[in-house]
């Protein structure tokens, strides 16, 4: 197991524990509590996948955080917070690419939580890149404005967009939706890669082909999902 994967899980477990204490003292609002529930499910899934005990991981995560806070000076902390709290808007797509109308020969659509995934299943044997415009905070994807899948010729063949009726989504929601889109496109023998900007802020790491670290089993499952549930 990669050491960064382990330490990331341990710190996430401890930070969830801290947020749970905030919720127990009735200091969290509705979005805060909703994210807490979502992240609890995510941590349980990650713990099961990694074969790690959440309680033990939480204790180690506490030690990691305490060590970092002890080593960090007040001035460094202020500078880090000033930089991290400044939300940035990143753009893979031009205004023309975002606003362009597109059509599907074999339209498929799936609602994935608060996001809508659309794709053209008539597209086969193409090299496809996923581009997105989104905001970033704490060096993580915060809010997705729009994601589109483009062929090398510039044709739009897929899209992920927030549902107006379900405002608010998490980084995990976006990753799940991207997994569904990739799975559906790869089912038809297309080669899909993700833009460097999206890789950097949506995933901690990427595979050697420029895509998110999805296992073959995940891809087959996601492809089957979009074929059977749209």
From Swiss-Prot:
Task: Map out region (CPSF4-binding) in residue numbers.
Answer: 180-215
- Record PTM text: Upon interferon induction, ISGylated via host HERC5; this results in the impairment of NS1 interaction with RNA targets due to its inability to form homodimers and to interact with host EIF2AK2/PKR.
Q: Name one GO biological process term.
A: symbiont-mediated suppression of host PKR/eIFalpha signaling
Pfam family of this protein, just one?
A: Flu_NS1
Give a yes or no for keyword RNA-binding in this entry.
Answer: yes
- Gene Ontology MF term list: protein serine/threonine kinase inhibitor activity; RNA binding
* Cellular component per GO, a single term: host cell cytoplasm
- Report residue spans for region: RNA-binding and homodimerization: 1-73
Q: Where is this region: PABPN1-binding?
A: 223-230
Q: Where would I look for the motif Nuclear localization signal in this sequence?
A: 34-38
Per UniProt, the short sequence motif Nuclear export signal occupies residue numbers: 137-146
Q: Does the keyword Ubl conjugation apply?
A: yes
Q: What keywords are assigned to this protein?
A: Eukaryotic host gene expression shutoff by virus, Host cytoplasm, Host gene expression shutoff by virus, Host mRNA suppression by virus, Host nucleus, Host-virus interaction, Inhibition of host innate immune response by virus, Inhibition of host interferon signaling pathway by virus, Inhibition of host PKR by virus, Inhibition of host pre-mRNA processing by virus, Inhibition of host RIG-I by virus, Inhibition of host RLR pathway by virus, Interferon antiviral system evasion, RNA-binding, Ubl conjugation, Viral immunoevasion
Positions of the UniProt region annotated as Disordered: 205-230
Predominant location category: host cell
List the subcellular locations.
Answer: Host nucleus; Host cytoplasm
Query: What is this protein for, i.e. what is its function?
Result: Inhibits post-transcriptional processing of cellular pre-mRNA, by binding and inhibiting two cellular proteins that are required for the 3'-end processing of cellular pre-mRNAs: the 30 kDa cleavage and polyadenylation specificity factor/CPSF4 and the poly(A)-binding protein 2/PABPN1. In turn, unprocessed 3' end pre-mRNAs accumulate in the host nucleus and are no longer exported to the cytoplasm. Cellular protein synthesis is thereby shut off very early after virus infection.
What's in the domain note? The dsRNA-binding region is required for suppression of RNA silencing.
UniProt similarity note: Belongs to the influenza A viruses NS1 family.
Which protein, by its recorded name, is this?
Non-structural protein 1
Q: What is the lineage of its organism?
A: Viruses, Riboviria, Orthornavirae, Negarnaviricota, Polyploviricotina
Q: What gene name does this entry carry?
A: NS
């Amino acid at each position: 197991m990669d050491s960064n994967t382990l330490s990331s899980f341990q710190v996430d477990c401890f930070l969830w524990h801290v947020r749970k204490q905030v919720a127990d003292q009735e200091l969290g609002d509705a979005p805060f509590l909703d994210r807490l529930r979502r992240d609890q499910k995510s941590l349980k899934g990650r713990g099961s996948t990694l074969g790690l005990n959440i309680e033990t991981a939480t204790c180690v995560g506490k030690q990691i955080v305490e060590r970092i806070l002890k080593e960090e000076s007040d001035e460094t902390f202020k500078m880090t917070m000033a930089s991290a709290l400044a939300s940035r808007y990143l753009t893979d797509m031009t205004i023309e690419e975002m606003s362009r109308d597109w059509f599907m020969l074999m339209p498929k659509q799936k609602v994935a939580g608060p996001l809508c995934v659309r794709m053209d299943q008539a597209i086969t044997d193409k090299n496809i890149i996923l581009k997105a415009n989104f905001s970033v905070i704490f060096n993580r994807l915060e809010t997705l404005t729009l994601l589109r899948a483009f062929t090398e010729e510039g044709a739009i063949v897929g899209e992920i967009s927030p549902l107006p009726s379900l405002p608010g989504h998490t980084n995990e929601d976006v990753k799940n939706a991207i997994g569904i889109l990739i799975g559906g496109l790869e089912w038809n023998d297309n080669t899909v890669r993700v833009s460097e900007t999206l890789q950097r802020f949506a995933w901690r790491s990427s595979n050697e082909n420029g895509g998110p670290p999805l296992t073959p089993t995940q891809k087959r499952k996601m492809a089957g999902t979009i074929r059977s549930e749209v």
